[in-house]
């Protein structure tokens, strides 16, 4: 049976990285990644994605504004869309709590460490020091099918980046920053913020970048129907 070890390895080896080296990414490399990702399939070829690439002064301006907005919102920021149900039910709650526990250990903060948790969120809004920040928007008049297409698009970006030696962190949390992004990027009112993504060269000396989350076995999420 023919296989594609390179593709398989890319999928298995891709990890979310939450700390990056102070090393620039050539803009041509970013263009190459997005030029490959544009071949993502979408429902009836609607291609719902729109991407903003932040580097240099623009990245600094947006991240500074985002951190200031977070610090100035003691009641919390409001997302563009509902992220998780409350309360989160099983089996998802167990998986979520396992991840949060490992992340807290790697970041050196527990769930009760409010200061440490806020410091982590601020790192998110600095793109974890990655030299490239990506912001993704979508026409808010579109429906759920377009979110499915968008997930495929984001995965292709991450795989294309990994194939070039780069790493990424997809960040739904950036949907909380839609007022800042609307101002800083002059987003049209019909565009909703779907997510952000950090892109760069991972700093693998960081404990948080040593995390490796488990996956459930095939039999737990697959039903084979023969008749």
Swiss-Prot record:
Function statement: Involved in the biodegradation of chlorinated nitroaromatic compounds. Catalyzes the reduction of 4-chloronitrobenzene to yield 1-hydroxylamino-4-chlorobenzene. Probably also able to catalyze the two-electron reduction of nitrobenzene (NB) to produce a nitrosobenzene (NOB) intermediate, which is immediately reduced to hydroxylaminobenzene (HAB) by a second two-electron transfer.
Full protein name: Chloronitrobenzene nitroreductase
InterPro entries: Nitroreductase, Nitroreductase-like
PANTHER family per record: NAD(P)H NITROREDUCTASE YDGI-RELATED, NITROREDUCTASE
Catalytic activity field: N-phenylhydroxylamine + 2 NADP(+) + H2O = nitrobenzene + 2 NADPH + 2 H(+)
Enzyme Commission identifier(s): 1.7.1.16
Enzyme class at the top of the EC tree: oxidoreductase
One of the GO BP terms on file: catabolic process
Cofactor names: FMN
Gene: cnbA
Cofactor note: Binds 1 FMN per subunit.
Disulfide bonds: none
Binding site for NADP(+): 44
Domain of life where this protein originates: Bacteria
CDD domains: PnbA_NfnB-like
Organism for this UniProt entry: Comamonas testosteroni (Pseudomonas testosteroni)
Protein's UniProt keywords contain Flavoprotein: yes
Protein's pathway: Xenobiotic degradation; nitrobenzene degradation; Xenobiotic degradation; 4-chloronitrobenzene degradation
Similarity field: Belongs to the nitroreductase family.
Any one GO molecular-function label of the UniProt entry: nitrobenzene nitroreductase activity
